[in-house]
Design a protein with these regions (language model features):
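Metal-dependent phosphoesterase signature
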Residues: 60-94
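Residues within well-ordered alpha-helical secondary structure of globular protein domains
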Residues: 29-32, 83, 194
């Protein structure tokens, strides 16, 4: 067995680093609560179909977020994400934050791997000193506008493992800790050397 001198720690964001899911919280912050609720009502049949696993969450999530943000200038969206970091900091879980800092002090390379959109996750997480944020990302057209489509696959389930391997390809070289709270973290748990559901 190869001795693993290096250590990597992977944290989910929504419900793991934060006390709750941030998608609708961010949408309300960016678009207002009224528009957020209109979208929820309009897309409730599609959300129900997704929960019954008739369509995958990637397609449902893309349709919903497209309704809110398609056509928005990327720079405006990015700035909203930067501003949201101040609010999101109040949602951090003290226990998970302490664990993240512990892993950093041990010399782990730390990644946040999230199905949420990079622009509202990265500003906060990078300020915590993580090495990188691996997440879902919006496509931006040549005019600098959001197309409403994702430029990468929704970073959920097995996609989380794929994204980690892009930045940490030599799996035999490191001991992997994984932390999450939902079924979207199952494949990462199975891929890790040690995991904890928080």
């Amino acid at each position: 067995m190869v001795k693993k001198n290096n250590k990597v720690a992977v944290f989910d964001f929504d419900g793991t680093l934060t006390s709750r899911d941030t998608m609708f919280d961010f949408v309300a912050f960016a678009c207002g609560k009224m528009r957020m609720w209109i979208g929820v009502i309009l897309f409730s049949p599609i959300i129900a179909i997704m929960l019954m696993k008739i369509i995958d969450n990637n397609r449902c999530k893309q349709m919903l977020l497209s309704w809110y943000f398609k056509g928005m200038e990327y720079e405006k969206f990015r700035q909203i994400g930067e501003n949201y970091a101040v609010r999101a900091r109040k949602l951090l879980r003290d226990d998970t934050l302490q664990l993240l800092r512990q892993r950093q002090e041990e010399g782990c390379r730390v990644y946040v791997v999230s199905a949420s959109i990079r622009e509202w996750v990265a500003p906060l997480c990078l300020s915590l000193g993580v090495n990188e944020v691996l997440s879902t990302e919006f496509e931006v057209d040549d005019s600098g506008l959001l197309t409403g489509r994702f430029s990468v696959h929704n970073c959920f389930g097995k996609e989380k493992v794929k994204r980690l391997l892009l930045v940490e390809p030599d799996r035999d070289d490191y001991y992997l800790y994984a932390y999450g709270d939902s079924r979207g973290d199952k494949e990462m748990f199975e891929f890790s050397d040690e995991y904890k559901k928080l």
